[in-house]
Amino acid sequence: MRFFRTTPRVLPSHPSEAEAIADLYQRAWQGCEQLLDLRLVRDMQPSMGEVRSWLQGGFELYRVEHGGHVVGAIRCTFPASACVLDRLAVDPAVRGQGLGRLLLEHAVSRARRTASGRIWAQVSPKLPAAVALHRDLGFRTVGQHLAAYWGEPLLLLELPL
């Protein structure tokens, strides 16, 4: 008898999954208060209602499930011939297994299908794994600014398509 490991797939999220996705963001950002400004961490931990509003209001949100649980997510929006990627999160219990890369690659592929001219992302330089992941996929730093509402410096990353 052979046992097969399931291959994770990226799927579009639905409003009925808002609670599971909000729980993922809570887990993914828990403990980051020691590294990042608390305002940034709290903003990255949306409520179920906020996630539901994303799904009903023009954002595309993709998820990865493992063992019946949402373990990764990324959000996309498409303003004026560009794509903005944000809210990339992976459950700490499954980090290091390529799920962040899988989600980011999916989002880049989605942007290509919309004929977006470029993709933008903002990443904290205090999250070197996130910065490295974006750079591995071809993103380059085109600016840095201090997000006053979060009290954190952020890198503006761009991937021309």
What label would you give each PLM region?
Residues 49-63, 84:
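A short helix-loop-beta-strand connector motif used in the catalytic cores of GNAT acetyltransferases and
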Residues 25, 134, 139:
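Conserved active-site tyrosine of GNAT-family acetyltransferases
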Residues 6-23:
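A short beta-loop-alpha structural element at the N-terminal edge
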Residues 111-122:
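Conserved GNAT acetyl-CoA-binding A-motif
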